[in-house]
Amino acid sequence: MAKDIKFDIQARNGIKRGVDALANAVKVTLGPKGRNVIISKSFGAPTVTKDGVTVAKEIELEDPLENMGAQMVKEVASKTNDLAGDGTTTATVLAQAIVQEGLKNVAAGANPMDLKRGIDKAVEALTADLAKQTKEVGDSSEKIKQVASISANNDDMIGDLIAQAFGKVGKEGVITVEEAKGTETHVDVVEGMQFDRGYLSPYFVTNSEKMTADLEDPYILLFDKKISSMKDLLPVLEPVAQSGKPLLIIAEDVDGEALATLVVNKLRGSLKIAAVKAPGFGDRRKAMLEDIAILTGGTVISEERGFSLENATIDMLGTAEKVAIDKDNTTVVNGAGDDKAIKERVNQIKAQIESTTSDYDREKLQERLAKLAGGVAVLYVGAASEVEMKEKKDRVDDALHATRAAVEEGIVAGGGVALIRAQVVLSKIKTENPDEATGVKIVSKAIESPLRTIVENAGGEGSVVINKVLEGKKDFGYDAKTETYVDMLKAGIIDPKKVTRVALENAASVAGMILTTECALTDIPEDNAGGGGMPQGMGGGMPGMM
């Protein structure tokens, strides 16, 4: 396909228009008084959301050059969402601010490579300062509630429920979000286990919207070797198929003819089935398979124990109320194992934790213990309508990710204040040349943008508030909800440090790429206007027939 080639200012301006189009749509959602965005769908009701990444993912622009800019900033939002689970709007706002300031300087003759080096140095210094500002969350359910409430758009009820869920399953437990049958939102704790292995083929997916394979009341086959041949599996498959129940296969690997046949049977609908790799490696894999066997009331089919796959019977299979599998994880809920056997296994792992001298082994044993004893907390989100349910579920997902990030890396003052406080370290950075120093100044100005946007969305004047916050010390900041100046930590306006850090790093990374772009290639659309007509000679005599 032919390419349209744009250079220099023409390329950068086109990309900037795309960046602005996407960022302006996303940033209206930032802060306690941020607004909703309504997204039209080709079928069904429109989606109403206040989640930055949901808005970003829907945006495709007509102009190919502008669309390139939009897609690059979309990458900032989705990468931040993948790593931190929240902070997507902050990341987008930061990226737009760095691009805006940077392009002004490039147009004025600054060297883009030096600017990028300055930007990278500034981000490194800010990240180090954020680490100094961080306070640990520990087991404080009050702090967990505050982080969750803010991330759920100041919804205290969601904050309470997430704090409750963390209280029940602990940091190591697994928390999932489901749609409730009624209008009530509540937390249920279900005994269960999650491990980090996803489905072996996307053809096993049963829910194409979420890309998950959900098996209700399945049999679970546990095998410690690779399965390549279908004939080994047939003795077990036949009675399972007759029972009409789904089957989950957990083995070292399933490949070749065996995997192909399972996929074909799943697609034909003759067998509800999914296969995942066994978690862990070596001896740890054997131990984890045994954990799953005890939890589900099954037996690990292992040649070491004298069992072989072709002689396996349906009695050796475990069962569970439900198994949910996505591309990365498998969650087994309400395994049918014997409570006494599970308790004995838990005590055995606790004894191993006490006797081990290796920190790594201790960590892995604690993970296994949490999976056996911690259980799964399910947050059921209820609402009066489907549209409200989806919007609320998005907020609960955000809040949950933010809370995990806070538990992992601690918290800093929220509302954009942590970045403003970190600004002072930028004046101490040693730079090689004036353009590098300009790169540092670009970041210094850009990190004011989250607070500025929060204030403007609340109807205030950004510059006035920023100056007032700069005059204050430590956690002094602006509460846009009440439009007053407060101590952010005492007022419970806090952000996970991980979210702020990841947003800043991703924004600077993509903005740096845009600033150092000198040439953009886009496809020239082919003109298909004459493509489908008749050959010329055929149409010539038609008018005379009238």
UniProtKB/Swiss-Prot annotation:
InterPro entries: Chaperonin_Cpn60_CS, Cpn60/GroEL, Cpn60/GroEL/TCP-1, GroEL-like_apical_dom_sf, GROEL-like_equatorial_sf, TCP-1-like_intermed_sf. It is found in: Cytoplasm. Keywords: ATP-binding, Chaperone, Cytoplasm, Isomerase, Nucleotide-binding. The keyword Nucleus does not apply. One of its GO terms (molecular function) is ATP-dependent protein folding chaperone. It comes from the Bacteria. ATP binds at T29, L30, G31, P32, K50, D86, G87, T88, T89, T90, G415, D495. Its EC number is 5.6.1.7. The keyword Endoplasmic reticulum does not apply. Residues 529-546 have a biased composition (Gly residues). Residues 526-546 are annotated as: Disordered. GO terms for biological process: protein refolding. It catalyses: ATP + H2O + a folded polypeptide = ADP + phosphate + an unfolded polypeptide. One of its GO terms (cellular component) is cytoplasm. PROSITE patterns: CHAPERONINS_CPN60 (PS00296). Forms a cylinder of 14 subunits composed of two heptameric rings stacked back-to-back. Interacts with the co-chaperonin GroES. PANTHER family: 60 KDA HEAT SHOCK PROTEIN, MITOCHONDRIAL. Belongs to the chaperonin (HSP60) family. Together with its co-chaperonin GroES, plays an essential role in assisting protein folding. The GroEL-GroES system forms a nano-cage that allows encapsulation of the non-native substrate proteins and provides a physical environment optimized to promote and accelerate protein folding. This is Chaperonin GroEL. It comes from Christiangramia forsetii (strain DSM 17595 / CGMCC 1.15422 / KT0803) (Gramella forsetii).
